[in-house]
């Protein structure tokens, strides 16, 4: 089966910023994403949980699979939201089966 190269972008951000982030992604031409709750983690500031340091709202993970040529627009849009808030952006290589969906 033929696969097609894609980029998987995962953005972990404070839940109250989800709408602002997803609206920025849509304006940048991102056609789809998935939003998942983040239960907890550990990072530069130490261990945290949904009920702890981050507050009741918690964090969310916004995951996008996109064509490589759309990456810069997505990152520019994401950075306008993430730069002033708690957040992590990661990019990994991916392969998809139906390129026309991305």
Model feature map: region roles:
Residues 1-102:
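Positively charged, small/polar-rich N-terminal and surface patches that mediate targeting and assembly
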């Amino acid at each position: 089966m033929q696969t097609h190269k894609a980029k998987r972008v995962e953005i972990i951000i404070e839940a109250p910023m989800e709408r602002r982030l997803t609206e920025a992604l849509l304006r940048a031409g991102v056609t789809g994403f998935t939003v998942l709750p983040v239960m907890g983690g550990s990072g530069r500031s130490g261990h945290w949980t949904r009920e702890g340091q981050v507050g009741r709202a918690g964090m969310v993970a916004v995951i996008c699979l996109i064509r490589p040529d759309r990456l810069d627009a997505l990152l520019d849009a994401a950075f306008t939201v993430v730069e002033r808030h708690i957040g992590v952006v990661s990019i990994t290589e991916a392969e998809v089966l139906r390129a026309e969906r991305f």
